[in-house]
């Protein structure tokens, strides 16, 4: 394996990288760095988490050291990714007088203009704000020799394809080296490459990265009305360190977040209507382990680069393979194992098969946890929580009350009563989620109404007996629709058979 020095990186940068713990380049870095140093255009197909920031950032530092004015522009789909890229570049260039600045929306543009006047060598920004500065002429392009597009397909998905064209057209082509990195290569990105890049060197690590055995992929067949209970049962059994949960709509994210909070889980939500300040606050909590469940839409989660995510749950199945790829790519990073679970209605199985066919690998069928598994997991969780409480120093007032209670009651009965109160406080909370009709079968239309479903945990049971439903005018239509989906479920009986006898624990052996 080549080291960074053998790839042509200077001693100063190599020392910095070694101090950061980077002794050997990743595959994408090994293949990209020599071409980047030569000034060749690069088309890299790789996911976030494969070391691609180093693939373009390390050689970029070598090129801008000692230069004056803006030398490079890096485009990123989101503010968070722009900040992460900028921070990593600052780490790579420690002690080398390289200035890196970020420009993105949601922050005062006047402050950014002031920083740009100082002539930083590297500017990292989102397309919209970069265009604002280009139109104001506060971002000078005449000295830019390197343009980098990070997660180009994400920018395209967010509607920035015309913005990317505009920006690429503004930077002089004769002196421009262009590096474009993307997890997928849709037609619009291919057209961008043909129009603006000069005989790019193609670096493709996707096949290996996407097939990474570090991510165990599962699907579980579940009806819409049972989905929330099944999901919380999985949470209790899996006990994820950090989990990202994907919902299809903003409403779904809001309702899921509220439902999880009401059940005692530490969760926050992200979607397009969340303010920038709130978004940064939520991400900070997630990274600092103040919350362990992040509920998000596809758009809100784009560009996130958070280490330590152990589980990804697709509460709503994604509508296309690209979205699925980006979702599960949030886990299984840096050599750590990850788990991705997709909840699928029986009539949505065509989408699972499509994902499997495109990615050329099969997901494992996973049946929902048994009641005994859930209860055991909750008992273990209670014991862990009590153990943590016992390590804290108690207030004298509470110790006095405790002594008085122990004189009056049996200690075992007293503890059991307190624990029962603790458990039932969350179990008795009734949760309401708006019914989301399943995705239509491929080449077929799907009918469905808008209704609401009530979910209640009910002391670990996840059957229908503990579910209370409120009367409403639409109750008769709800029964008709349920019969319709039940008939469809029977048609998919063969799919359900594959789940028999298979548990999450079975797949871990």
From Swiss-Prot:
Subcellular location: Cytoplasm
The EC number(s) this enzyme carries: 3.6.4.13
Binding site residues for ATP: 46-53
Enzyme class: hydrolase
Ranges of residues in domain Helicase ATP-binding: 33-203
Gene Ontology molecular function terms on file: ATP binding; ATP hydrolysis activity; RNA helicase activity; RNA strand annealing activity
Annotated Gene3D superfamilies: P-loop containing nucleotide triphosphate hydrolases
Motif (DEAD box): 150-153
Enzymatic reactions: ATP + H2O = ADP + phosphate + H(+)
Disulfide topology: none
Compositionally biased residues, Basic and acidic residues: 483-492
Helicase C-terminal domain span: 214-375
Superkingdom of origin: Bacteria
Listed InterPro entries: DEAD/DEAH_box_helicase_dom, DEAD_box_RNA_helicases, DEAD_helicase_CshA, Helicase_ATP-bd, Helicase_C-like, P-loop_NTPase, RNA-helicase_DEAD-box_CS, RNA_helicase_DEAD_Q_motif
Gene Ontology CC entries for this record: cytosol; ribosome
Keywords: ATP-binding, Cytoplasm, Helicase, Hydrolase, Nucleotide-binding, RNA-binding, Stress response
Chain residue ranges for the region called Disordered: 440-509
Bias (Basic residues): 440-459, 467-482
One Pfam family from the record: DEAD
Motif (Q motif): 2-30
Biological process per Gene Ontology, one example term: RNA catabolic process
Described function: DEAD-box RNA helicase possibly involved in RNA degradation. Unwinds dsRNA in both 5'- and 3'-directions, has RNA-dependent ATPase activity.
Family: Belongs to the DEAD box helicase family. CshA subfamily.
Assembly: Oligomerizes, may be a member of the RNA degradosome.
Protein name: DEAD-box ATP-dependent RNA helicase CshA
Organism field: Staphylococcus epidermidis (strain ATCC 12228 / FDA PCI 1200)
């Amino acid at each position: 394996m080549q080291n960074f020095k053998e790839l042509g990186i200077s001693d100063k940068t190599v020392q910095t990288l070694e101090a950061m713990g980077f002794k050997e380049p990743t595959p994408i870095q090994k293949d990209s760095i020599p071409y980047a140093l030569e000034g060749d255009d690069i088309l890299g197909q790789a996911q976030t988490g494969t070391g691609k920031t180093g693939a373009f950032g390390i050689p970029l530092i070598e090129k801008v050291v000692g230069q004056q004015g803006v030398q490079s522009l890096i485009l990123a789909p989101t503010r968070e990714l722009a900040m992460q890229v900028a921070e990593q570049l600052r780490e790579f260039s420690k002690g080398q007088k390289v200035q890196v600045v970020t420009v993105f929306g949601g922050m005062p543009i006047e402050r950014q203009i002031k920083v740009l006047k100082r002539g930083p060598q590297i500017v990292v920004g989102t397309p919209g704000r970069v265009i604002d500065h280009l139109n104001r002429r506060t971002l000078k392009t005449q000295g830019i020799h390197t343009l980098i597009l990070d997660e180009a397909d994400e920018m395209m998905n967010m509607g920035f394809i015309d913005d990317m064209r505009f920006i690429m057209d503004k930077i002089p082509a004769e002196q421009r080296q262009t590096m474009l990195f993307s997890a997928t290569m849709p037609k619009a990105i291919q057209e961008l490459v043909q129009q603006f890049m000069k005989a790019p060197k193609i670096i493709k690590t996707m096949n290996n990265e996407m097939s990474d055995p570090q991510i165990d992929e599962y699907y579980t067949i579940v009806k819409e009305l049972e989905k929330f209970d099944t999901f919380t049962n999985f949470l209790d059994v899996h006990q994820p360190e950090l989990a990202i949960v994907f919902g299809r709509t903003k409403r779904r994210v809001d309702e899921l977040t509220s439902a999880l909070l009401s059940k005692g889980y530490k969760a926050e939500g992200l979607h397009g209507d969340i303010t920038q300040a709130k978004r940064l606050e939520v991400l900070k909590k997630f990274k600092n382990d103040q919350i362990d469940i992040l509920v998000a839409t596809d758009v809100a989660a784009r560009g996130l680069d958070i280490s330590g995510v152990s589980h990804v749950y697709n509460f709503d199945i994604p509508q296309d393979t690209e979205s699925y790829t980006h979702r599960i790519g949030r886990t299984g990073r840096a050599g750590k194992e990850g788990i991705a679970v997709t909840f699928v209605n029986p009539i949505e199985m065509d989408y699972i098969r499509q994902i499997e066919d495109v990615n050329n690998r099969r997901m494992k069928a996973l049946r929902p946890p048994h009641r005994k598994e859930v209860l055991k997991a909750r008992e273990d969780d209670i014991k862990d929580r009590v153990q943590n409480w016992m390590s804290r120093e108690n207030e004298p007032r509470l110790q006095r009350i405790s002594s008085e209670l122990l004189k009056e009651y049996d200690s075992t009965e007293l503890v059991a009563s307190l624990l029962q109160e603790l458990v039932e406080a969350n179990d008795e909370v009734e949760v309401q989620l708006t019914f989301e009709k399943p995705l239509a079968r491929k080449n077929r239309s799907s009918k469905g109404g808008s209704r609401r479903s009530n979910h209640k945990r009910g002391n670990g049971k996840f059957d229908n007996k503990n579910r209370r439903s409120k009367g409403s005018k639409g109750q008769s239509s709800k029964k008709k629709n349920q019969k319709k989906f039940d008939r469809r479920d029977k048609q998919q009986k063969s799919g359900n058979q594959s789940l028999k006898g298979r548990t999450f624990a079975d797949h871990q052996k």
